[in-house]
């Protein structure tokens, strides 16, 4: 009976190990509330300053992203709106957020057993961010950052309340590498790249912006406002936002 019980416990541990490839820890260090969002797993969570949310990501997860929503106001049923990053007016996101929003993107246990991950500004910028493996292993498996004052320095053409749009959102078209086909960096993509060299600045910015870690043995951490404070141009709380659903 004892051996049977031990075997069952071992089976459960093995099943958990097999099912989850990584944990994604999301932490808010901003001096304001951030409503974190995660798809296709996780949904959403209110994070006051200093709070953390841990997401268990299954093996093979791909096209996944984590972002922060700002100046949100949700009712007790989890319905409402956000100034940036809104995902259809719900707390629990099932689709992508409305730009602008700084993105942490990842795909787990893919080609050659590697995790692929990045910070993307292809949907613009709203919150400074660090994305890092908790157990870096060298090479391209190390912390990456986008912490510049992009909102404060945003070109006039891309400015919106609470953030800075990518030109693909504002203008679209091949001129800004928003469609398939050869293209190079533009004035606007250079603006983002110079301030956040680790991050994707336009859709075809792969060579300097994709990072890899060993799949199945690496966990990750996303930190909003990693320096613990926001620039003056970053969003403040909306009136009544302390009455949102938690």
Curated annotation (Swiss-Prot):
Natural source organism: Nicotiana tabacum (Common tobacco)
* Protein's cellular compartments: Vacuole
Q: What is this protein called?
A: Osmotin
Q: Which UniProt keywords apply?
A: Disulfide bond, Pathogenesis-related protein, Plant defense, Signal, Stress response, Vacuole
Chain's gene name:
AP24
**Is Signal found in the keyword set?**
yes
What processes in GO biological process is this protein linked to? defense response
Q: Which CDD domains match?
A: TLP-P
Q: Which InterPro entries is this protein grouped with?
A: Osmotin/thaumatin-like_sf (IPR037176), Thaumatin (IPR001938), Thaumatin_CS (IPR017949)
